[in-house]
Amino acid sequence: MKYNVGEIRYEKGVSLRKLAQQARVSKSYLQKIEAGEAKPSLEIMVRLAQVLDRPLDQLYQVE
């Protein structure tokens, strides 16, 4: 599964550190999500969607 978190974060002009803090995840874990090296829980994806002000489905990339 791939995620659009990094692209959306970049578009919104939000730093990795700020998004990690607001979504209550570690910066290193967020980096792994963006790199496709981690499979975040639905709860974490919901928090990321809320912070990024995007619908949850936009955070997932269909392959």
Task: State where each predicted segment sits.
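A short, Lys/Arg-rich alpha-helix, primarily the initiator
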Residues: 1-11
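Alpha-helical transmission elements in cytosolic ATPase-linked domains
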Residues: 4, 32-35, 47
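Residues within the helices of the helix-turn-helix
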Residues: 6, 17, 46
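The alpha-helix within a helix-turn-helix
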Residues: 9, 20, 49
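Short alpha-helical DNA-recognition segment
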Residues: 13-32
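DNA major-groove recognition helix of helix-turn-helix/homeodomain DNA-binding modules
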Residues: 43-58
